[in-house]
């Protein structure tokens, strides 16, 4: 069997098949469905305790101990500007660090775990920082890019934050082979900062959902490659779905072809089951135009397997095979 690029061959709807079950949300969407932005967190400073003492008649009685915490004026938020992710492409994030107090902070470091999660005994990251992508703003004015260090996590260093100011980092991360792709999957990304001397760590998270859609490819083969006049020939059309959403009848995907030379007495099968003319396909022995009926073509979703050692995810596409056999 040989594969050829087909002339006069189209798959109507295949390259336009996008089934979005979780369309991107806007940066400013604060609805309950938008889980990409978490409530801002403030730094905890020192915890302090206090106890009163009562003395009378040579006796000493201690009160209960009270506990309270000092809060700094720092606030950290993280937002995924890109609403969904797929096997290829980038996710855009924004981290905002706001100083609402009267104390200036210098040389702060903001870290990003790039969505790290555990697979077996290994920790893998489904995202890779896009080199040179970070843009740094202080009070809305672009600044020189911060120092970027990539180790166990992504770190932006040397950030100074005067009293009453707001720092914003916008950067991109590329989806890699460890990103989960099955329907319903998410990447949970955590940012943190040291807050300067004497201040505890603050974290903020952003969650991005996988894009749920079909992703179709199509190929065609002919057998035999050399056929005599009035001989029989079989065309095999293979449709693969690399996406996490199946093609179902209501998606109305159509395969069409023009057989030249024209075939006669054709037999058509889909995944080994014979299709009836009129309900499964239409064909003209005058023009050679062949078309499947809308709804006859279905393709299962891909399946995904993750290596427990490396964390790399392999994709097994869903496949449907259409054959057309006739006489030349």
Description of each model-found segment:
Residues 22, 27-328:
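Exported/extracytosolic protein signature
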Residues 7, 18-21:
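Intrinsically disordered, low-complexity segments enriched in serine/threonine/proline/glycine
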Residues 10-16:
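Cationic, amphipathic, low-complexity segments that mediate targeting or membrane/lipid association
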């Amino acid at each position: 069997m040989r594969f050829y690029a087909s002339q006069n061959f189209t798959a109507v709807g295949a390259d336009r098949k996008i089934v979005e079950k979780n369309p991107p949300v806007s940066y400013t969407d604060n609805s309950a469905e938008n889980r990409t932005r978490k409530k801002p967190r403030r730094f905890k400073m020192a915890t302090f305790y206090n106890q009163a003492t009562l003395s009378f008649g040579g006796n000493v009685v201690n009160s209960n101990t009270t506990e309270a915490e000092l809060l700094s004026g720092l606030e950290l938020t993280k937002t995924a500007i890109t609403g969904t992710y797929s096997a290829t492409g980038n996710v855009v994030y924004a981290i905002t660090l706001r100083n609402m107090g009267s104390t200036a902070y210098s040389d702060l470091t903001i870290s990003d775990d790039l969505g790290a999660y555990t697979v077996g005994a290994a920790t893998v990251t489904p995202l890779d920082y896009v080199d040179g992508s970070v843009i740094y703003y202080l009070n809305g004015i672009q600044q020189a890019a911060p120092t970027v260090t990539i180790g166990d996590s992504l770190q932006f260093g040397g950030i100074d934050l005067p009293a009453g100011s707001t720092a914003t980092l916008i950067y991109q991360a590329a989806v890699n082979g460890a990103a989960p792709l099955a329907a319903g999957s998410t990447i949970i990304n955590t940012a943190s900062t040291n807050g300067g001397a004497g201040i505890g760590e603050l974290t903020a998270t952003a969650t991005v959902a996988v894009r749920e859609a079909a992703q179709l490819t199509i190929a065609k083969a002919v057998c035999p490659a050399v056929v005599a006049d009035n001989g029989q020939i079989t065309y095999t059309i293979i449709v693969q779905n690399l996406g996490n959403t199946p093609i179902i009848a209501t998606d109305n995907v159509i395969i069409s072809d023009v057989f030249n030379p024209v075939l006669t007495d054709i037999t058509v099968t889909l995944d080994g089951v014979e299709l009836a003319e009129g309900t499964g396909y239409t064909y003209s022995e005058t023009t050679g135009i062949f078309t499947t009926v809308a709804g006859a073509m279905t393709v299962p979703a891909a399946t995904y397997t993750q290596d427990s050692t490396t964390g790399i995810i392999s994709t097994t596409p869903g496949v449907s095979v259409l054959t057309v056999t006739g006489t030349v």
